[in-house]
Amino acid sequence: MKRLKDAISKGEILFFGAWEGDALVGCCSITVGFSTFDYMPSGTFEDFFICPDFRHKGIARQLVQFAYKSSPISSMTVACAQCDIQMYKSLGFSIQLGSLFAFEP
């Protein structure tokens, strides 16, 4: 938990929310890293959720765009399950960068 708190306090993980009055109806985070490709900060989009009653109303797209524009990043990627690819494409993640593999020691 301390490592998470430290990362948040250093701005390495940024959290964003979508609100309807006092109710949190959506959230996401961006983990900030550094891209050696373009020598700029880059972000990994994570922790994405929209409450079921608020889906298909444009909130997800607004949240993604707000998070990107509010972050100090020049690019943003997301890793997702095959079943979520179309959703992320509809939200603006349109450049496929090959395949992602997780290392297992």
Positions of predicted regions on the chain:
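A conserved beta-turn-beta hairpin within the catalytic core of GNAT-like acetyltransferases
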Residues: 33-45, 55
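Active-site rim helix/loop that mediates acceptor-substrate recognition in acyltransferases
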Residues: 1-15
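Conserved acetyl-CoA-binding loop of GNAT-fold acetyltransferases
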Residues: 89-99
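Conserved beta-strand in the GNAT
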Residues: 15-17, 23-32, 44, 49
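Conserved GNAT acetyl-CoA-binding A-motif
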Residues: 70-81
